[in-house]
């Protein structure tokens, strides 16, 4: 990559490409396509994409929790060929700024204990709150992480 990808808020025309990134990165464990459209309707400023030369390379999705002081990083995905250039970090920081602008004080996320992305999360200041067994069903354990914003 000669020039850095542009980070921007997702558009309706990005929905299929976002879903394809999800399938490419997560395989069978993906959100249904309609979820991204609904997320865009709920939190338009928190669904970001990374784009280079008209191609989407990744996305990040933030959302609001039931506790209005708490937000979530619901999903983060970068295509394998676009990894190693800091896209995930850039997108996470922009989602965090979007949450902060909405008055959110804390952001949480869950991550598979075997996912190497957790190194990024800890480096960005996330702290482990718990390890929850079977979070998404049998054998789907997750670490619950949180970061204070601001």
What residues fall within each predicted segment?
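Short glycine/proline-centered loop/turn elements that form peptide/ligand docking sites
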Residues: 88, 92, 114-117, 134-139
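Short phosphate-binding/catalytic loops that engage adenosine nucleotides
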Residues: 78, 87, 104, 126
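Acetyl-CoA-dependent GNAT
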Residues: 2-5, 9-83, 92-94, 98, ...
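Residue-level recognition of strand-loop junctions within catalytic nucleotide-signaling folds
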Residues: 112, 148-150
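Short amphipathic helical patch at the helix-1/turn junction of helix-turn-helix
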Residues: 78, 111-112
